[in-house]
């Protein structure tokens, strides 16, 4: 656990022993990822869901429990490894690192803004923009985070924004299908939709494609002009 979490969270929060228990059950195709928790104080169900979907989990019921109130940070690592063994799908070290970073960053964000639901929704909205628009540069990712925060009416401290940008740069390198992302974390994205944030209209074209379309449109206009002579 310390191997994956040590860079992102104090050892006092991680604890000396992994006390959480994780159960992962594969469910029918299209059902999405659903997480329930009991006696977990640091991470919410939505935080786990966001991070697990980033790690590539699909169609699974995940139950995280503690013998008493515990942080539950080790549960993410346990859930990813259990899913990998159960399905035979390998989860790379980089992907596990990105998902772990995401979980901790979301928990820290929730503490900073005082609202776990808003923190979960901000991460989900910004992540969708980063992945669908293939954003990799810090300034572009920062704009995606800030625009998502504005849409949700959240004021995020600058130091937290910087941490989120660093985390999202890692997420941007993970091979995640955007449509699958929204389906697997459907509960969170439905909340965004209810809040009036429609991510279905996000422009997913990269800069190269936009430039190509621009010149294609010019060429088409020239052809139409000469065809009319």
What role is predicted for each listed range?
Residues 46, 50, 77, 81, ...:
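Solvent-exposed, polar/charged alpha-helical surfaces in well-ordered, non-transmembrane soluble domains
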Residues 38, 69-72, 208:
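Conserved phosphate/pyrophosphate-binding and hydrolysis machinery centered on Walker-type P-loop NTPases
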Residues 43, 91, 114, 136, ...:
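Short coil/turn linker and secondary-structure boundary residues
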Residues 1-63, 85:
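N-terminal, leucine/charged-rich tether regions that mediate assembly and partner docking
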Residues 53, 58-154:
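Soluble oligomerization/assembly scaffold segments of membrane-associated complexes
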Residues 26-34, 56-61, 104, 124-126, ...:
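Acidic/histidine-rich, surface-exposed loop or edge segments in extracytoplasmic proteins
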Residues 154-229:
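Charged, long alpha-helical assembly modules
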């Amino acid at each position: 656990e310390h191997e994956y979490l040590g860079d992102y969270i104090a050892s006092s929060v991680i604890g000396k022993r992994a006390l959480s228990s994780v159960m992962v059950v594969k469910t029918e195709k299209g059902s999405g990822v659903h997480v329930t928790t009991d006696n977990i104080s640091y991470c919410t169900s939505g935080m786990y869901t966001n991070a697990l979907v980033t790690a590539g989990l699909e169609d699974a019921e995940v139950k995280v429990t503690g013998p008493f109130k515990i942080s539950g940070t080790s549960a993410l690592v346990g859930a990813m490894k259990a899913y990998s063994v159960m399905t035979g799908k390998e989860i790379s070290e980089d992907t596990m690192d990105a998902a772990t970073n995401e979980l901790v960053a979301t928990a820290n964000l929730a503490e900073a803004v005082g609202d776990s639901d808003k923190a979960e929704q901000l991460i989900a909205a910004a992540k969708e923009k980063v992945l669908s628009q293939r954003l990799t540069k810090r300034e572009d990712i920062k704009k995606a985070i800030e625009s998502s925060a504005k849409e949700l009416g959240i004021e995020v401290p600058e130091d937290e924004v910087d941490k989120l940008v660093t985390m999202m740069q890692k997420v941007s390198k993970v091979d995640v299908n955007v449509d699958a992302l929204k389906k697997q974390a459907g509960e969170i994205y439905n909340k965004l939709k209810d809040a009036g944030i429609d991510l279905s209209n996000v422009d997913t074209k990269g800069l190269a494609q936009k430039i190509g379309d621009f010149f294609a449109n010019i060429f088409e206009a020239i052809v139409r002009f000469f065809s009319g002579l």
